[in-house]
Amino acid sequence: MRTLIWYCYFWGYMLIHWPTLHRGLKQLEAGDWQSGDALAKQHVPHWANRLLKLAGVTVEVYGKENIPADRPCVFAVNHRSYYDICLMLTQMDAPHGLVAKKEVGAIPLVRGWMRLLHCVFLDREDPRKAMTALNEAIDNVKKGYLFMRSFIRRIIR
């Protein structure tokens, strides 16, 4: 039953807040990154935190004070589930993005919210497209966004 409630909330929130997402994406297309970031900061941590609570996850953070506040960071995690992403979205104060496999970018609504979070979709089958995506992630880090990259043995197959 908990899983059903979790999925209903996951998709329900995205559907209910589709107009907000649409507005944020329009702002990004117009070059207004600050407004898009503000929308993401307002909605995404709340959504991710609720998902963690619905799953029964208790969060304890140690060492957050060691994260430099004056420059962007890249977090390389050995991620085993999507809860790692939810944790990052709820615990990091600075604007952030993700590097995700391209297949995630094919999921409606999820793709839009991830674009609002400056997510870069990585094509692991095509080395040139993968390098383009990684260069885009590097540019986002230079702009001041925290980035999370899951550790895998090989980025490109």
Placement of each model-derived feature along the sequence:
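A transmembrane-helix-recognition feature enriched in membrane-embedded lipid enzymes
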Residues: 1-60, 112-113
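Soluble catalytic domains of membrane acyltransferases
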Residues: 54-157
